[in-house]
Amino acid sequence: MANAARDPYWLATVRRETLTFPDLADVIEDKCATCHMPLGKTELSADSKTALIFGDGFKNPGHDLHGLALDGVSCTLCHQIMSNNFGAPESFSGGYLIDLDTQMGERVNYGPFPVGKQPANLMQSASGFIPVMSSHVKESALCATCHTLYTPYIDNEGQIAGEFPEQTVYLEWLNSDFANTMSCQNCDLPAAEGQVPTSNMAGKPKGPFMQHYFVGGNAYMIQMLSQHWDDLQVTASSDQFKDTLSRIFDQLSTRTASVLIEEAQVTGSHLSVDVLVESQVGHKFPAGFPSRRAWLHLVVYDGNGSVIFDSGSYDQLGNISGNDNDLDASRYEAHYEVIEDPEQVQIY
């Protein structure tokens, strides 16, 4: 969230798109800035201006909104979002609504707790926002404003021909069993034990207090941000990155998916194995932008410890053995019910 604007993979992807389709560069940058640089984008939207990222845009240190845009997805962005269009198609793809008519200093920040007059005055004085209790901050539809994303696609003539569902995490959750028991916030903002003071001044302990960890599965990107913190203008400390990585690895290993060999049979010289993969998340696995993937890696050894079958191995660059897509970007590896050859690999 905090590094949404600094994500080098995202920046490189957007840049590649603008170089490939220069006539649509402004449209692409404005669209992508909506959710990755929402503070700067919202500020420009108030003046009906287009948000640019490269050149003289937000990435330029000389831009008036450079620092604001680099803050990525901040507290005051999400907590200003109104619920007027929640769950409706117009709320998706960065369609969040923020009150731009009320002057700064009088705008509302929504939260889950009731706020007394004195604490409200203190917060308004310190932050410029008036705290207001509203249960909509606990709804998954809040997250859906950016995590249900449809992006335009181009036809052979270079014209926008429609939209493609780039990610539909909210809709996946909405159609899952989790929709009746858990919200996005239940997993991404785990509740702290006990009650917690919500202010350094006149703050009485309250609960449940949701810890804003937003733990995902992208350990690779967190490692890259940590290693290149200076070049990427990262403000988090080394210890904070280590803590985040620890949470990611814990989630991936214990609360993401389980792999179980249900049955293994040897008939003559033939070994057959039934494998069950169970998702433990409230949406597709893997979820999010399409570059993410998960795959089955099955290795069979003989009595001497030598490998006699290996499906799903990978090299130092992350290329999966047998994956047609790694060999040719225009191809896709087929899905399999049965794998009989090491060059076949089940990829999700």
What annotation goes with each model-predicted range?
Residues 2-57:
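Long, well-ordered hydrophobic secondary-structure segments characteristic of membrane-embedded
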